[in-house]
Amino acid sequence: MATLLYLTDLYYQAKGRNYYTEDLYVTSRLKDHFDLLIGHPRQVLSNLDCADLIVFRNTGPVMWYKDYFNRFVATALEKGVRTFNSLDGKADMKGKDYLLQLTAEGYAVIPTVERVEDLAQLGMTEQYVVKLKDGADSIGMRIVSREELLQAPPVDQLIQPLLHFQYEVSFYYLNRRFQYALNAPHKEQRWALQEYQPTAQDLAFADRFLAWNNMARGIVRVDACRLPDGSLRLVELEDLNPFLSLEVLSEGKREQFIQRFIEALQEATVS
C-alpha cells in the first residue's frame, strides 16, 4: 500500500466546528487503504521523504506559520514532492490578494480594494469590512465606517463593502468535479449548515472560479453569498485545506465522497 503523511492540527480551536472530529473520521476510513502517518503541519519539512503523498487537511490558518509554510511549498516544488492538494493553486493557498485580481478582472466577487483612494470602486455603502490578507476564520476582520477608514487607512489589508445578503452557500469540488453544496440559511448562524441543491446557474458560477484557479488536484471549496437580487458573489476560494463539514451530509452522500476521496488519493500516489 502507498504511504500517506496526513497533516492536521488536532488541537486547533476553530469557530463553530471541530477539526479533530472530521480528521479522526477521515483517517479512520483511509487506514484500510493506505499506510497512514499523521503529523502536524509544522513538522512536515523533516518528513518529506517518509511518504508517497502528503495530504494537507485541517491544519489551521497558515498565518500562524507563514514562513515555515512558504519554505515547505518551495522545498516540495523543488524536490517534486507529491501533495494533495497540489501546490499550484492561486487562491487562499497564497493569501487573499487574489480577491483584488478577481475584482479587477470583473468576476462576480465581493468587490475588493486595498487603498482608501479606491473606495469609489466599492459603490455606495455606509460600512466596510477590513480583512487581513492572510486571515482565516474571520481572524482580524473589522467592520468600520467610512470616516474610520479615512482617519486610519489600513495598511496591507483588504477593504470590502459590508453587503447585506440572504445567506451563505458553499460548493465543494474534488479534482474539479462537483461533490455537494451546503448553505447556512440563517446568516446569523453561519456554521449551522444544511445540504443545498444547487441550480445549473449556481454551478456555472462556481465552475468559473474552478477554471480560473486551474489547480491540478485537490479539494476546493467555493464560498459565496446570495444577494437580495438572487445573484451570487464570491466570498473566498479555499484551495488549501477547506473544512468539509462531512457531518452535515446524509450517510449516502458522505460515503460517496469518502470513496471518491480514496480513489483520488490512490491516483495521486501513482500519477
Tell what function each PLM region has:
Residues 106-128:
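Rossmann-like NAD(P)H-binding beta-loop-alpha module
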Residues 1-6:
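Extreme N-terminal starter segment of soluble prokaryotic enzymes
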Residues 137-233:
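Phosphate-binding site of ATP-dependent enzymes
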Residues 10-111:
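Conserved N-proximal alpha/beta basic substrate-recognition cap immediately N-terminal to
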Residues 43-50, 74, 119-125, 148-150:
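Short amphipathic alpha-helix with an adjacent loop that forms part of the alpha/beta core around
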Residues 226-271:
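C-terminal active-site "lid" helix and adjoining low-complexity regulatory extension at the edge
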Residues 51-56, 131, 171-173, 180, ...:
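A short beta-strand motif that forms the metal-chelation/ATP-contact edge
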Residues 83-84, 110, 129, 158, ...:
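Structural detector of well-ordered beta-strand residues that form the stable sheet scaffold
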